[in-house]
Structures are given as structure tokens and as C-alpha cells.
């Protein structure tokens, strides 16, 4: 029964993330509300921060990026806090089987395949950043440095995103990275008593990240083709319109 309840609870979190958070695509909503436009009709036709940067400028893109990161990170932290600090939930016998990052997976998938926009959304990179921070802040710092290095040299944002998605797979599967002190947010079981049962399931977060990384890489398939053909666009900022 533990396995069944665990699956049902985490499936509910996944659907919550997919339908109520991920499927509300930030760049589509803002482009329609603020610009009376649709971001998906411009440049790469992608509903994400990079295309927002090219189409509407840095300020618009920063808002999109920050919102996409936070719409993944904050709900994960809220679920974690509820499970750990609300007595009624904490006393629930299956609370220790809840993986808050199941919600994050739903957000990433919803962002890429939004239910309310004909399943045509972004590439999931910014939302995955929120997931990364929730797993371990050190992973985010590693990702940030790799991204800066790659984009600084190549001037190609997509190459930076692709490299980060691949590179973090080397780190996220280290058990100490998941449940060590710097994994405090949702994984450090010595600090989050409700998740002590998950100590034997440390690989849950790496599996969730691996799924997200795979989706991010698949969503960059056209970028792969342009990189191979050496026709990928380099970094450029459009003035706000």
C-alpha cells in the first residue's frame, strides 16, 4: 500500500504542477497582455526567455525568466514546508513518501507542452533551473558557471543550455549532492525529518532531473541541427519595443 499511496500522492503533485502552473506559459501570457502579440509568431517561435530577449528586449525577458524559475522553485519549497511544518500533514502516515519535486516535473512538462496553448510552449530551461535550485543550490552555481563560460565563448545561448543539461547529469547522480547539507531545501534528510523515509530513495530527485534534462534536450532538437550546420544565431539583445 505504501507504494500505491506514494504513486497517487506524487501523481497528484505532478498534475498540480502541470495543469495549474506549467501550462500557464509566462511569455505567452505577457506577450498577449502587455504587447498585444504572440511571442510564438516571432524569431524562433519559441515561448521562452531567449526568444523574449530577441523579440521584446532584456527587461521583458528577465521578467519571463525569473517568473519561470520561481513558478517551479516556490511551489516545491511550499510543499516541502507544508509537509515538514504543518502538524496535520506531518502526522499523515504517507507524508514521508511525498517528493515535492514531482510537482516540479509537472511544471517543466507543462511549460514545454502547455495544455492551454495547443501543447506549444517553451523549451523548459528556466523552469528546470528552478528544479535544480530546489535539489541543491550548489548544482545551480555549477550550472550558472558552465552557462556563462559556454555562452561567453560561443555567444550562443542554446549551446549554453544544452551543455548545462548534459553536464549536470554528472553531478546530480552523486548521493552526497542530493542528501548532503547543501541539499537542504527538500533533500537533506538530517534537517527535514518528514523525508527520512526517502534516505533509501535518494535517486528520486536525480531521476526527476534526468527526465527534465531529456525533455529540455529534445526541445532543443532544431538547435542541434543549426549547431551542426553552423547556422545557429548568436547572442543579441533587441531594444525594448
Curated annotation (Swiss-Prot):
Subunit comment: Probably interacts with PlsX.
Transmembrane regions listed in the UniProt entry: 3-23, 63-83, 97-117, 131-151, 156-176, 198-218
Pathway: Lipid metabolism; phospholipid metabolism
Catalytic activity: an acyl phosphate + sn-glycerol 3-phosphate = a 1-acyl-sn-glycero-3-phosphate + phosphate
BP terms from Gene Ontology: phospholipid biosynthetic process
Assigned keywords, A-Z: Cell membrane, Lipid biosynthesis, Lipid metabolism, Membrane, Phospholipid biosynthesis, Phospholipid metabolism, Transferase, Transmembrane, Transmembrane helix
Subcellular location: Cell membrane
Protein name: Glycerol-3-phosphate acyltransferase
Predominant subcellular localization, coarse grouping: membrane
Family: Belongs to the PlsY family.
Pfam families attached to this UniProt entry: G3P_acyltransf
Membrane topology: Multi-pass membrane protein
Function: Catalyzes the transfer of an acyl group from acyl-phosphate (acyl-PO(4)) to glycerol-3-phosphate (G3P) to form lysophosphatidic acid (LPA). This enzyme utilizes acyl-phosphate as fatty acyl donor, but not acyl-CoA or acyl-ACP.
Gene Ontology MF annotations: acyl-phosphate glycerol-3-phosphate acyltransferase activity
This protein's GO CC annotations: plasma membrane
Annotated SMART domains: G3P_acyltransf (SM01207)
Matches recorded under InterPro entries: G3P_acylTferase_PlsY
